[in-house]
Amino acid sequence: MSELKTISIRGAREHNLKGIDLDLPRNKLIVMTGLSGSGKSSLAFDTIYAEGQRRYVESLSAYARQFLEMMQKPDVDQIDGLSPAISIEQKTTSRNPRSTVGTVTEIYDYLRLLFARVGVPYSPATGLPIESQTVSQMVDRVLEFGEGTRLYMLAPLVRGRKGEYRKELAELMKKGFQRVKVDGQFYEIADVPALDKKYKHDIDVVVDRVVVRPDIGTRLADSIETCLTLADGLAIAEFADRPLPPEETSAGGSANKSLNETHERVLFSEKFACPVSGFTIPEIEPRLFSFNNPFGACTTCDGLGSQQKIDEALIVPEPNRTLRDGAIAPWAKSTSPYYNQTLEALGTVFGFKLGSRWSELSEEAQEAILHGTKDKITFHYQDGARSYNTTKTFEGIVPNLERRWKETDSAWAREEIERYMSAAPCPACAGYRLKPEALAVKIHALHIGEVSEMSIRAARDWFEVLPEHLSTKQNEIAVRILKEIRERLRFLNDVGLEYLSLSRNSGTLSGGESQRIRLASQIGSGLTGVLYVLDEPSIGLHQRDNARLLDTLRHLRDIGNTVIVVEHDEDAILTADYVVDIGPAAGIHGGEVIAEGTPSDIMSNPKSLTGKYLSGELSVAVPGERRKPKKKKEVTVVGARANNLKNVTASIPLGVFTAVTGVSGGGKSTFLIETLYKAAARRVMGARENPAEHDRIDGFEHIDKVIDIDQSPIGRTPRSNPATYTGAFTPIRDWFAGLPEAKARGYQPGRFSFNVKGGRCEACQGDGVIKIEMHFLPDVYVTCDVCHGKRYNRETLDVHFKGKSIADVLDMTVEEGVEFFAAVPAVRDKLVTLNQVGLGYIKIGQQANTLSGGEAQRVKLAKELSKRSTGRTLYILDEPTTGLHFHDVAKLLEVLHELVNQGNSVVVIEHNLEVIKTADWIIDFGPEGGDGGGEVIAQGTPEEVVKEPRSYTGQFLKELLERRPVKKVVAAE
């Protein structure tokens, strides 16, 4: 039977798909595009991937199936030509603090193996290598000293420890030993002077005295074995006739000698041990380098690399406040007089008053309040009618909170104290997560923690030249390991992630970054004959890096895989072998194949909206004139230097639309989100989060609100929906409660809530579905047979408005809801804003966990639009065009520019040139990602930025503005 050339889909009806019939070529790069909500993901993920995965899992045994997530069978008549499917979605890789870029890509596993096999342990005390040897190797080494050499074979019994050691010396005499070397002097055991137990001593047992000759191998082996047994794996050969040079017997001399030693000596160890400090390393195995294994993890932080510590900046968030006005945050809300009376007593000693600002207090006073006093202080307390004095030391706020946090069993109390804590690098391992023994093992002067800290670009360069610094034997052992590491680093580099470090926590990655990491891992696995389904891999990627990403996708195809990509990026669509355009609109108005074929077929199809944008027939317009920033109305960040920012000072003009641009890893998010947003939220909104390191920020007096509209879910449960989030559900319930039928029955608005008892169906508790666990199959959600999925009981559903119950209203699309509630402004106005941001196709009661990141972001935007504008709000959006088609981008820009027209300020982090070209002002970071970035390369209008030769954004923007003549305008003015 010949291999099928196509993936044949018949009757796909999942979600909004309208019985799609489609034949997709196998082993090709296929792009699915179309408006947001048109059904692309329903076809690619919920139909094609789900069926491919389901069939593969179904072919496994029942025992294996219980460990794998089983997909629901999609609503489709037939699919032929499927391969086992792998999906790579936008989800952040892992929130587990133990998951890093290195562990996800398996590079860290190879690093552990490399360090275990070719790493050399070094002594932290001397900086010299530590080696382990067999008895035979030790004998051979002694014989190399030369014939006639006189040696003492010593067993180092005590190394730098206090004590008298009378019992130990008596025990040695019983065993037949006669001489010892104590603190550098030889004695007969019976003549050893009494040792002062207050001082540290060194004691070596003289096991043998030998003169090196070729025939003493057997005697030497016996002596060395005795030494190793006595001294727990250590033996010393000391030259009797070779004193150390005078300069090495002075303080700070040789690393090979202990206190008062005056003769040259060689230490042998059957373990890895330091001759000076006695620092030993257990057997060097890969698990020693794992921070997820007790064998290697730092015992202080359990391998996390950081510890929660009380943060002084959170205890005193506003140093210019007075003590009476609540400068000390943990005490600010208390109504008890105790805290003020405590401060008054401290003030008497350290010279301050309750009316003093924290910043005016002396360092000594601040230290006493935060960390306590050594000397006793008399405190006077008045508690109602009772008055008393007490003399004691003051514990200090920081030690007090730390003690209570450790001692309390109350989750609430711990949470309350954790508000004043932040993560600080572990003091024991300096954030490297590993035990000292693991960090003592080095390759080419670096330990595994230092290699992990490198950026992928730097690590790639380091591993390229590493073989030159290894011995022939080490290279033989490491050749295959190095090949695997270098390949994986190259793949990460190819998908535009060269600025990340291997130690970067997975939970801090953006959706696009984590997706590209998984993509790099897949290329590393080298699978063929697989169906890959990807969701917008270009998210968060600068145009400059797009070509490398597309090369990667083509490589996946060329090794014999079918690659399906849901994508809106113009370059990705034009590079595809086959394009499927889903539409014509979103939601119930979509779900059909509008056009399919090569990119040129799409462009020549008159029905395809995508084709019109690709051909230039439609375009997002450049505004007729740009708003001019007012000189004195701006927020200025001075001296931002967190992560890779190089002491950046930049101003964001207010009352205009600003785009923060630059290559991935250039420092955009650190500057805008970590520094500016967190500082503004703290100052303007009273938030508690700590901003990243900077000197100061000027201009907050011009804004009264700062809002970060991100793509996080609007709710994680099926009970949360667009109506509850935007506040539309409250007036809907109020309206139904005010209807004659509801009044006659005495129903209150709560009756129409599916979250509380009363009006909801109790069989499913207002969920509309009941979960049934199936052990070898996926959990099945069946429609509740009492309310039939309506969520409410029969009595509640008896109340109708225009013939519709509350359940019918929640099942309407936003578009239908606007028409239905045309005469109810309180509801209509909230729904109109959802319609405005292009969400007319979603259902009013659609479960929040079914919304994409882009949809969730636009629901948040709609909520902001529906509020009364003060004209002084700063809106911050991180890549708002994620998941948006060209046409959706045009609509979104209308909304954002409308917010600016109301006097507000909008700042977006964006790579999409269609958005950047409409900005009034651009701040471009770079020039590269990671260590090569962190500077402001250009700032000004788009026309000014294109003139900056170092700006990659400027180069691509110039191309776009020159290349695309606008024939028809669809966008914001």
Swiss-Prot record:
Zinc finger (C4-type): 761-787
Binding site for ATP: 34-41, 662-669
Swiss-Prot/TrEMBL GO biological process terms: nucleotide-excision repair; SOS response
InterPro entries noted in UniProt: ABC_transporter-like_ATP-bd (IPR003439), ABC_transporter-like_CS (IPR017871), ATP_grasp_subdomain_1 (IPR013815), P-loop_NTPase (IPR027417), UvrA (IPR004602), UvrA_DNA-bd (IPR041552), UvrA_inter (IPR041102)
Subunit architecture: Forms a heterotetramer with UvrB during the search for lesions.
Family (UniProt): Belongs to the ABC transporter superfamily. UvrA family.
Role summary: The UvrABC repair system catalyzes the recognition and processing of DNA lesions. UvrA is an ATPase and a DNA-binding protein. A damage recognition complex composed of 2 UvrA and 2 UvrB subunits scans DNA for abnormalities. When the presence of a lesion has been verified by UvrB, the UvrA molecules dissociate.
Name of the protein described by the UniProt record: UvrABC system protein A
Source species of the chain: Rhizobium meliloti (strain 1021) (Ensifer meliloti)
